[in-house]
A protein has these predicted regions:
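Hydrophobic anchor residue at the start of the ABC signature
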Residues: 14
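Conserved catalytic motifs of ABC-family nucleotide-binding domains
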Residues: 21
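Helix N-cap at the start of a conserved alpha-helix in ABC-type nucleotide-binding domains
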Residues: 36-38
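ABC ATPase "signature
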Residues: 85-86
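Catalytic Walker B motif of ABC-type/P-loop ATPase nucleotide-binding domains
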Residues: 25-28
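Helical segment within the ABC ATPase nucleotide-binding domain
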Residues: 40-53
Length: 126
């Protein structure tokens, strides 16, 4: 598979996973590092899998827009703690926000600036 593009590798990996008709499909950052066209193709493939197969898909992503586009329900993990697992609209309503990114900051009690400072501190400690 090394001669395939990263996007094609992702699609082949997803297709291989479906050969066994799984009841649970775990996808960890399936579109990270892909060019825009490949990212859309993988997202379309995930939607197709949701539509055609009776499987639960657990999608881990840092891309809040992608999560909103692909998920029926979203959960936010903060330092290993699951803050909630709800439909996207309920998450936004719960925090009175318009985006999942805003919901993340509301759920974790941190602002963007604080998150950035903590990330820098972690980098220094590493």
């Amino acid at each position: 598979m090394e001669h395939l593009s990263r996007g094609m590798q992702q699609k082949v990996s997803l297709a291989r996973a479906l050969l066994t008709s799984p009841v649970l499909l775990l996808l960890d950052e399936p579109t990270t590092g892909l060019d825009p066209r490949s990212k859309l193709e993988v997202q379309d493939f995930i939607r197709e899998v949701r539509t055609l197969h009776d499987a639960t898909i657990l999608l881990c992503t840092h891309d809040m827009v992608e999560a909103e586009m692909l998920a029926e329900r979203v959960g936010i993990l903060d330092r290993g703690e699951l803050k909630f697992l709800e439909p996207v609209d309920e998450v936004k309503a719960r925090f009175g926000v318009e985006t999942l990114e805003e919901a993340f900051f509301a759920a974790t009690g941190r602002s963007f600036e604080e998150e950035t400072e903590e990330d820098r501190d972690r980098e220094v400690m590493a």
